[in-house]
Amino acid sequence: MAHTDGTAERPLGTVLVAGLGVSGAAAARVLLARGDDVLLTDAAEPAVLAELVAAGARWLGALSEPPEDVHLVVTSPGWRPDSPLLRTAAARGVEVIGEPELAWRLRIAAPGAEPAPWFAVTGTNGKTTTVTMLESVLLAAGRRAVAAGNVGRPLIEVVTARDADGTPAHDAIAVELSSFQLHWSSSIAPAGACVLNVADDHVDWHGSFDAYRDAKAQLLRLAPVAVADAGDPVASGLVGGHRHPVTVTLGEPERGQLGVRAGALVDRAFSAEPAGEVLVELDALQVRGPHNTVNALAAAALARVAGVDAAAVGRGLAGFRGGAHRNVLVGSVDGIDFVDDSKATNPHAAGASLAAYPRVVWIAGGLLKGADVDPLVAAVAPRLAGVVLLGRDREVLARSLARHAPTVPRTVVPSGDDGGVVTDGDSVMREVVAAAVRLARPGDTVLLAPAAASMDVFTDYAHRGRAFADAVRALG
């Protein structure tokens, strides 16, 4: 049971696994089970070290260059291309790949069959929602599907998993891939690929916006069908020259598109009917907002590539409930709704979230990572009832609000970045929510859509979202 070109059975020689988080540890386990010679490196000793060493791996501690006998480096997304270890490996001609590329090379298949196809999604925002929507649709169609990659389980675990009878455990994989993962991928050829959108993000890691965009485009290179949002100029431009482009639109779909007609999602890309085929009524979807309609259309497009009929697409999308910290209503108090979109970690995502509500008290701030917030603030100013700012880069947002929304009331909540004021994230969020309540009136939405990363005050975006929900519940 191997990948049809035999890669899954060939020894890889000595492999250095750089970074032992969830995906790195999973890669090391699979390599050890194959009998490969596995070396381990990381900045600090990981929790899984004893397990991996007991299985036969060798721990080398922190490295600035690979040992001379290394044939392959498998790196984790947190390792930048300009890190000394990876730069030295490249200079020596040692191949560097990520865990998804390793998974593609090592995927298994039943005798005489192809490995399970990948239906892959990337983009600045909406990846996780689209991939989990796609998983829901594939499961509704009776496929043995799973969401994996940058969401859920590591791909290397999924593509090598077997049922009790030894056959592959999955017959379709909904794959989320980040730009970091795609940077280290060269041969991944999904059956269908989607670039949802491309906005200014992660430029610090990639070095430039062009490099970031090109990493996203890598996903489309070997895919027979390429999907993008027609409303995103960069993403739609990437599929424009593809041999089989499909776009999704919030408007009436043309031939080759999926879109919206008379309150329903309609397929005019894969349906043989001249007018297209209705997939699902918009009112049947449990996730709201134009951005989620685009996500649903993209998931539907990839499901159609997988051969899923319209009825199953409709069932899968209607049954999808959405993920945590992604536009989730966490409570209503005195006629004010409180919505957690802590996953909106950049301006593009925050803009999509804000567009779903007519009058908003916006909770924003954190680590902007150099992103330009002026276009966002200018676009959303008319719907702002007030703004509460927190986090390290709150003053950047405050200056933008002064330029583009000078009449909107705003409150700045101090945090541990204020030299001498040391508070934990949960107490900061309680102050933030209290300030938002003072700015809101019945009918407003208090929206946590920070447009920034969370690690200045919180452990991660999930911690930020939980702190918000806890603070709302404490209002009574």
Predicted features and spans:
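Short internal beta-strands
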Residues: D36-A43, V227-A230, I363-A364, R383-D393
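Beta-strand->loop->alpha-helix junctions that form or flank phosphate-binding loops
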Residues: D42, G61-L63, I97-L102, V146-G149, ...
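Residues in the short beta-alpha loop(s) of Rossmann-like NAD(P)-binding domains
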Residues: G21, A44, V151, G231-D232, ...
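N-terminal leader/targeting and accessory segments in enzymes
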Residues: M1-L106, R288, L475
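C-terminal helical cap/extension that packs against the catalytic core
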Residues: A50-A57, L376-D444
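Phosphate-binding loop of NTP-binding sites
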Residues: L32, E68, P77-A230, V234-H244, ...
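Residue-level signal for inorganic ion chemistry
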Residues: L31, V73, V121, N150, ...
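Nucleotide phosphate-binding/pyrophosphate-handling subdomain across enzymes
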Residues: H3-T4, A8-T14, A25-R34, L279-A385, ...
